[in-house]
């Protein structure tokens, strides 16, 4: 029998895009790999990434992550110019790319980055096919969330 690997302390999540779930209805989620350079991997291991304004563009049969900011480390290579906001290629199956093309061509759909995390030794990004929320939808979600918290609080005190 093989031994299980010891779980490393800390979370595998590098960055979350909380604003995406607030501003969009997420209909489908996909997991994609990222084509990264060495300095970007070091920055991700240090947790210096921001995907708050990032989205996915589809061009020439490929998907690219646009708007993600990976802050370079201070001790990065001096002979290589680090571009923190460069467009990074997403690694998806052709079937997944075809599905995304079909969904994006419909009016009002976009693809946003939801989270950036480690899966084994690989950096993955969770992307979601999304449709924009109206202001009243955001208010309804906020009311539902507050009611769920109040309900949990009431149930906690009722058990005493």
Swiss-Prot record:
Keywords: Cytoplasm, RNA-binding. Gene3D superfamilies: 2.40.280.10. Signal peptide: none annotated. It is found in: Cytoplasm. GO terms for cellular component: cytosol. It holds the Pfam family SmpB. GO terms for molecular function: RNA binding. It comes from the Bacteria. Its main location: cytoplasm. PROSITE patterns: SSRP. One of its GO terms (biological process) is trans-translation. Belongs to the SmpB family. PANTHER family: SSRA-BINDING PROTEIN (PTHR30308:SF2), TMRNA-BINDING COMPONENT OF TRANS-TRANSLATION TAGGING COMPLEX (PTHR30308). Required for rescue of stalled ribosomes mediated by trans-translation. Binds to transfer-messenger RNA (tmRNA), required for stable association of tmRNA with ribosomes. tmRNA and SmpB together mimic tRNA shape, replacing the anticodon stem-loop with SmpB. tmRNA is encoded by the ssrA gene; the 2 termini fold to resemble tRNA(Ala) and it encodes a 'tag peptide', a short internal open reading frame. During trans-translation Ala-aminoacylated tmRNA acts like a tRNA, entering the A-site of stalled ribosomes, displacing the stalled mRNA. This is SsrA-binding protein.
